[in-house]
Regions:
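Contiguous transmembrane helix-bundle modules in multi-pass membrane proteins
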Residues: 131, 147-158, 168-185, 193-234, ...
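Active-site-proximal, structured, solvent-exposed surfaces of multi-pass membrane proteins
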Residues: 349, 375, 616, 648, ...
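Transmembrane-helix motifs of polytopic, lipid-linked glycan transferases
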Residues: 104-121, 160, 347-349
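Hydrophobic alpha-helical membrane-insertion signals
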Residues: 7-78, 255, 269-276, 286, ...
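Extracytoplasmic
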Residues: 260-267, 549, 555-719, 725, ...
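Transmembrane-helix signature of polytopic, membrane-embedded enzymes
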Residues: 117-136, 171-177
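Transmembrane signal-anchor helices characteristic of membrane glycosylation enzymes that use polyprenol
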Residues: 13-49, 234-247, 372-375, 448-457, ...
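Membrane-interface coil-to-helix junctions
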Residues: 24-113, 132-155, 269-343, 376-392
Length: 830
């Protein structure tokens, strides 16, 4: 091949793509390059979760694998554990570190999508258009703003994983298998199983489609071999992440994802997450239109009504100036939303064009995957289908926030658009057919926008009924608080509420109409470009350039509604800082006590763990028994349970609203001896007894969990001279000194977890058992002795060995495949 042609056809578009993606990412996150920081909720929470882990690692070089900083203590498998044998993640995975986040998120999302499109046969110039649509889809900016780091990386790697499957089943099987193994290893290593799961469902749709076609074409033998290669790549990808997967799988059985031993609670069921809890964030059926029209349902929960709108005018008339800032313009069914999953009107139009023009083999599995994912996203709004999926789709009941399935649609829409544009690029579509398809795609998408813009106000109620009920209660409260009950008797509360609800509905309708017109304009711009190409007024290079511009014009302004330079702050403001209450508590150098912070939502906030061992925390997979304790006792700040958790301090709102420390004098301490043991026949009886028992003198032990105690007859008789003290503390190591005149049971204010914790008395391993539903207990011999607790992930050496072997196989396979494919390409070009 001529060198100049190589530059023009391969190198130039690659340089253009990378340069454009970098410029777009850097421009969007320009404050990052000025040294400013983006305060991200989940990142801030993560810093609290992992604080004692990071501190110990920095101080000693040892990885504790356990945190004592939140929920009384829990394994760190789903927080921060170092797995040295994950070589793929620690080598190839470091490429993404060359550009810092958040700009790196956008850049590599677009690069990954662009590379996938090249692999499936899309021209690189066409790929730029689809990559922009994928990387700039609004959901990415929402999760970047929230700090969902693992989710974002999983979405970066997902297109590459899908392209590996495509190549394995359709192209060079060995190169495809190598790519699948490498990309799937990175995808799994991103540590967001939910995203990986949804893309595996999409991959299954592709595999089924290829299987059907192979059967029809008599290629089942070839298909079977390709399937075997794909499965082998998947096994190696899993193996290269075996360590985190193994420990996560073992640990998940003990968490709310594995179910509760009690009757189903709000968050757990017997076999997984409770259906109501898992489907709390379900996309409304009508809400799906915000994939096309961003403000269809009032934007986000935090969006208020405009100061010059009808709602403000009505409330001003009632003397409630400024009250609009307390009302949300969002009228969907989700409890809270940070914004819509807007895909771009132009991108949706191109996807519709893809449905009309793409070859059946390429499109039907994509369409099927999109339909299934949208139905799953509806969750409780399509409960029959959701219940079916929960019962029969393996592993599906382990995940919450079902609306997240739309990430597959977010990937599929640009892909469908690229498949359509590729047929135009190759000149495969006759002009008449192209114009008919263009009219159909523009008619469907543009027609929907036009209908919403012109008649949308009469098609929906814009949450008017719910608003009327809410405002009725609000006005009734106002009238009662101001001794104006006569207004209520005259029905003024209802009349005022109805007028306000009408105004709220009108403002929401205006927001929808404005964005419907906007989306229509974007569709017309994209359709106009395709029409000019069909009429041969512009060439294919101009068309792709025009469509790339439309993608930027369409998506960036909407993205900026939710995440802009205004969200950035100085690095210092982005740090977690200790309050006066925190500083006062930190003067207490005793290592054993815990803190309950009531100035935040204590069981949905990990910032307290940045400074203290916290009773609360923030995690989506906390231990199931601890969740039971929260539901039954801690949510009501039960004194007895707080005492057994050695809660020495509360942080409460002070007189001037500032956090204030309160010392509790009844906490039991880091460990204590009990006079007697009560045996409970079931987990339900165990937790019930906590509220009926003096836990300072009596331990509650499950009858199904042998106490391994030689002193079953109770009471044991504790003398005044008995003492036990925590003398050394690290997350994975605790040391106690005790003196005891006769054998007795000691309860330790540490969370029971027998998959890694071992107890030693004077250096010899000793048995222990669970007491008080979540704590540890031991029968200790008389005398003066030392008790040590050590945590180590069980089977660490063997598990890491499997991870290392699979990682090496993937890396060597990738190198071999690269050499093989390069030689094949060279021979072909000769």
């Amino acid at each position: 091949m001529d060198f100049s042609n190589t530059i023009r056809s391969k190198l130039l578009p690659a340089l253009a793509a990378f340069a454009l993606f970098f410029v777009v990412s850097a421009a969007y996150f320009a404050p990052q390059f000025r040294g400013e920081a983006l305060p991200q909720h989940d990142v801030i929470q993560y810093e609290g979760m992992a604080k004692d882990i990071s501190d110990m690692r920095a101080a000693t070089g040892e990885d504790p694998q356990w945190t004592g900083g939140m929920f009384g203590g829990m394994p760190a498998y789903l927080i921060n554990v170092a797995y040295p044998a994950q070589l793929v993640k620690r080598t190839v995975g470091q490429v993404v570190k060359i550009i810092d986040t958040p700009a790196g998120f956008l850049f590599f999302a677009m690069v990954s999508m662009w590379l996938m499109l090249l692999i499936v046969g899309i021209n690189p110039w066409v790929g730029i258009v689809a990559a922009l649509a994928y990387g700039l889809s609004t959901y990415f900016l929402l999760i970047i703003g929230a700090g969902h780091v693992t989710k974002m990386w999983a979405l970066v790697y997902a297109p590459l994983m899908m392209s590996g499957a495509w190549m394995t089943l359709r192209g060079n099987v060995w190169c495809g298998a190598a790519l699948t193994g490498l990309a799937a290893s990175l995808e799994i290593g991103a540590n967001h199983p939910q995203i990986t799961y949804y893309f595996l469902v999409a991959m299954a749709a592709f595999w089924i489609s290829e299987g059907i076609l192979s059967f029809r074409e008599g290629r089942l033998r070839d298909f079977s071999l390709r399937t075997a290669a794909l499965v082998a790549a998947g096994i190696l990808a899993v193996g290269s992440n075996f360590s985190p997967l193994w420990y996560t799988a073992r640990h998940s059985k003990e968490t709310i994802r594995g179910g509760s031993e009690l009757a189903a609670t709000a968050e757990t069921s017997k076999n997984g997450l409770a259906l109501d809890y898992a489907t709390a964030w379900s996309y409304g059926k009508a809400e799906t239109l915000n994939l096309l029209v961003p403000d269809f349902m009032g934007r986000e929960s935090g969006t208020t009504f405009p100061a010059d709108g009808q709602t403000a005018a009505v409330l001003n008339d009632y003397g409630l100036r400024g009250a609009t800032q307390q009302l949300s313009a969002y009228w969907g069914t989700q409890p809270y939303t940070g914004g819509p999953t807007y895909l771009g009107a132009a991108a949706v139009f191109l996807a519709a064009l893809g449905i009309a023009l793409a070859r059946g083999r390429n499109k039907w599995w994509i369409i099927a995957a999109c339909v299934v994912m949208i139905l799953l996203a509806w969750g409780r709004n399509l409960m029959g289908f959701t219940e079916f999926a929960f019962k029969y789709l393996p592993g599906y009941n382990k995940f919450r926030t079902v609306s997240m399935t739309l990430v597959v649609v977010q990937w599929a829409v640009p892909l469908l658009g690229a498949l359509a544009l590729m047929r135009l690029w190759k000149g495969e579509i006759p002009r008449e057919r192209l114009l008919r398809a263009l009219a159909w795609a523009a008619g469907i998408t543009g027609g929907a926008c036009l209908l919403l813009a012109v008649a949308g106000g009469s098609l929906f109620d814009f949450g008017r009924a719910e608003s009327a009920d809410y405002m009725t209660d609000t006005f009734r409260h106002i009238f009662e608080s101001n001794n104006m009950r006569s207004y209520i008797h005259r029905g003024m509360d209802i009349e005022s509420a109805e007028a306000t609800a009408d105004a709220m509905a009108a403002d929401r309708a205006a927001m929808m109409r404005a964005d419907a017109w906007r989306s229509l304009v974007m569709i017309l711009l994209a359709a106009g470009g395709v029409a000019l190409f069909a009429l041969r007024r512009i060439n294919r290079y101009v068309l792709t350039g025009l469509l790339a511009g439309v993608m930027l014009l369409d998506l960036v302004p909407v993205d900026l509604r939710f995440l802009s330079s205004e969200n950035f702050v100085s690095p210092r403001r982005n740090q977690v800082t200790a309050s006066a209450a925190d500083k006062a508590i930190m003067q207490d150098k005793d290592p054993g006590y815990r803190v309950l912070n009531l100035t935040v939502s204590p069981f949905n906030d990990a910032t307290t763990s940045y400074f203290h061992r916290s009773v609360g925390g923030y995690h989506g997979a906390k231990l199931a028994r601890y969740q039971d304790l929260i539901d039954r006792y801690l949510s009501n700040a039960d004194d007895g349970v707080l005492d057994m958790l050695n809660t020495r301090y509360l942080i409460v709102p002070g007189k001037e609203g500032q956090p204030e420390a309160q010392r509790r004098t009844t906490a039991f301490g880091a460990a204590w001896f009990v006079d007697s043991v009560i045996y409970a026949p079931s987990a339900q009886a165990e937790i019930d007894l906590l509220g009926k028992t003096d836990l300072r003198t009596t331990a509650v032990v499950s009858g199904q969990n042998p106490a391994k105690s030689a002193s079953r007859p109770m009471p044991l008789g504790i003398y005044a001279s008995a003492r036990i003290e925590l003398t050394e503390y690290r997350p994975n190591y605790l040391k106690y000194e005790y003196t005891l005149p006769e054998e007795a049971v000691a309860v330790f204010s540490e969370i029971f977890y027998d998959q890694g914790w071992k107890a030693y008395v004077d250096g010899e391993e000793s048995p222990y058992f669970r007491a008080d539903y979540v704590l540890r207990a031991m029968t200790l011999p008389a005398g003066t002795h030392t008790v040590e607790w050590r945590f180590r992930a069980p089977g660490w050496t063997a598990v890491e060995g499997v991870t290392l072997a699979a990682s090496l196989a993937i890396l060597l396979g990738a190198v071999a495949a690269l050499v093989y494919c390069f030689r094949k390409r060279t021979e072909k070009e000769k």
